[in-house]
From Swiss-Prot:
Domain text: Has three domains with a flexible linker between the domains II and III and assumes an 'L' shape. Domain III is highly mobile and contacts RuvB.
Biological process per Gene Ontology, one example term: DNA repair
Region (Domain III): 157-205
Organism: Shewanella frigidimarina (strain NCIMB 400)
Protein name in the entry: Holliday junction branch migration complex subunit RuvA
Location(s) in or outside the cell: Cytoplasm
Lineage: Bacteria, Pseudomonadati, Pseudomonadota, Gammaproteobacteria, Alteromonadales
Transmembrane segments: none
Ranges where the record places region Flexible linker: 144-156
Subunit structure and binding partners: Homotetramer. Forms an RuvA(8)-RuvB(12)-Holliday junction (HJ) complex. HJ DNA is sandwiched between 2 RuvA tetramers; dsDNA enters through RuvA and exits via RuvB. An RuvB hexamer assembles on each DNA strand where it exits the tetramer. Each RuvB hexamer is contacted by two RuvA subunits (via domain III) on 2 adjacent RuvB subunits; this complex drives branch migration. In the full resolvosome a probable DNA-RuvA(4)-RuvB(12)-RuvC(2) complex forms which resolves the HJ.
Family according to the record: Belongs to the RuvA family.
Region Domain II: start-end pairs: 65-143
One Gene Ontology CC term in the entry: Holliday junction resolvase complex
Region of interest: Domain I: 1-64
Amino acid sequence: MIGRLSGILVEKQAPEVVLDVNGVGYELQVPMTSFYELPALNQAAMLFTHFVVREDAQLLYGFITKQERALFRLLIKTNGVGPKLALTILSGMTASEFVSCVERDDIATLVKLPGVGKKTAERLVIEMRDKLKSLLEASAGSEREFMLQSNYTPAAAVDSAEEDAISALLSLGYKPAQASKSVSAAFKEGMSSETLIKAALKSML
């Protein structure tokens, strides 16, 4: 099993990235919470990984921290939650925000995420409450565990920021009208794709 990958970030199109490791390009699906932390293209990055084998595909999921990966693994063990929905949940809120929802029985916030109905939200709260205790203990005082080159600079804003943001939201399961409306409302001149996606997601919670 591949536990982590370190290499050069050669492609970024939320929620997918490609990491070049010694000449081999690994395609990974990453939650937006991890995507926001990634460097610009052609910079060094490291991601903790989870490997999923299906009948029709073999997929790699990448995470900035072990804690995010641990939460992803807990989510996919919940009845009715697969990797795609787990990725959507982690893209819509941070790990700490999710933990807070579970602790407060905040069904109303969880159902705002695409693909999460009332029954799924209730099941998440019930099944995840005890499982999260170990995650919280592991997360206490933890630091970000990814390495970037010392000359790292944030990715520059691009003209297609709105298109990239809408595409990312569609990939996460949001409806076209909802994605377009939230991106348009959140957009400000000079915004990068990452910043715009983050603002659009926040506006829907």
